[in-house]
Amino acid sequence: MEKFTPSELCADIKIYDYKQKVKYDEKSLVIFEKTGKMIKAGKECEGMLYTLPANSIGFSPIVLGRVSDYTCAEKMLKQMLCRYLGKPVFAGYGEGLIFVHEKLNEVEMKAYFDLLYQAGAKNVVYADESVKGIPEGTPWEDVIWGMKNTYKNLRFAVEITKEQPMDYFKYSLAELAENCKRWGLEEEMSKLYI
């Protein structure tokens, strides 16, 4: 399978601070020392991925909208929320919304609930593109800001998306081609591209 960089595979993360009315753009990227200590998380990793010290590794804990490494995703999200919302008080950050654009199964949804609870959310609300009552053509950013009208106690929201979906498309095709080869279906795969 062709090689994809962590930057191509990583999810884009948007953190909405309802209290300050500010949105922060991040990347699902982390750099860890081989000892397990996280060095950096988010967009600040992008420039370092190609010049990593020998004792460190860079990767994305959220790929194709799914949590691929729970422990790293938890540490990354905690650091991002602390960076933008400040340190959680005794009761945590309050109510948080997780908005994921990919279709998830129940287990994948639970991973996001658990991530937000572990990161300091007191209560978690889940939403995706199947939200009812949204006028067609409404930007998702407006929908997420508007969730505060429905859930009055929301303190923050975390949106998991992909600004360049073509990266996901290329990766998914390469993965499909690899699986077809493994299953002995290369001829059938080639017919799909004709």
Name these PLM-found stretches.
Residues M1-D25, F32-K37, C45-I144, T150-I194:
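Nucleotide/phosphate-binding catalytic cleft detector across ATP-hydrolyzing
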